[in-house]
Amino acid sequence: MRHKYRKGSSFERELKRLLEKEGFAVIRSAGSKGVDLIAGRKGEVLIFECKTSSKTKFYINKEDIEKLISFSEIFGGKPYLAIKFNGEMLFINPFLLSTNGKNYVIDERIKAIAIDFYEVIGRGKQLKIDDLI
């Protein structure tokens, strides 16, 4: 269990450093069970719940996502589920997640609704369909 926590806190610190490099002020709330990082820059507020796994499939408790959404609404920030999945950093709008039970399933299909770090901070590149053909 301790190793699992260490992996998660390492990812939180990595994301915190990336956000700070981009000019965000960041607060890490370790052990919060619902909100791990709060980042702000010039009136923009981003709120993250961070999860990491080396498995091809894992589960996130529905209550963790509900806490993220609730806190974000009260605080006035934009919520993101930040996932380090098989070494790749992905960000998901929690409103796009769906569940039939107590947990959300995270697997390769999550990439269909995920965005990358630069899209989260507003520096993403938008592609036109013509560019892909």
From Swiss-Prot:
Residues at which Mg(2+) binds: E12, D36, E49
Manner of cofactor binding, per the entry note: Binds 1 Mg(2+) ion per subunit.
Alphabetized InterPro entries for the sequence: Hjc, Hjc_arc, Restrct_endonuc-II-like, tRNA_endonuc-like_dom_sf
Keywords, sorted A to Z: DNA damage, DNA recombination, DNA repair, DNA-binding, Endonuclease, Hydrolase, Magnesium, Metal-binding, Nuclease
Catalysed reaction, written as an equation: Endonucleolytic cleavage at a junction such as a reciprocal single-stranded crossover between two homologous DNA duplexes (Holliday junction)
Family: Belongs to the Holliday junction resolvase Hjc family.
Record site: Transition state stabilizer: K51
Transmembrane spans: none
Classification via SUPFAM superfamilies: Restriction endonuclease-like
Listed cofactors: Mg(2+)
Family matches, as CDD domains: Holliday_junction_resolvase
GO MF entries: crossover junction DNA endonuclease activity; DNA binding; magnesium ion binding
Assembly mode: Homodimer.
EC number: 3.1.21.10
HAMAP family: HJ_Resolv_Hjc (MF_01490)
Keyword Chaperone annotated: no
Disulfide bonds: none
Pfam annotation, one family: Hjc
Name of protein: Crossover junction endodeoxyribonuclease Hjc
NCBIfam families cross-referenced by the UniProt entry: Hol_resolv_Hjc
Entry function: A structure-specific endonuclease that resolves Holliday junction (HJ) intermediates during genetic recombination. Cleaves 4-way DNA junctions introducing paired nicks in opposing strands, leaving a 5'-terminal phosphate and a 3'-terminal hydroxyl group that are subsequently ligated to produce recombinant products.
GO terms classed as biological process: DNA recombination; DNA repair
Gene: hjc
Enzyme class: hydrolase
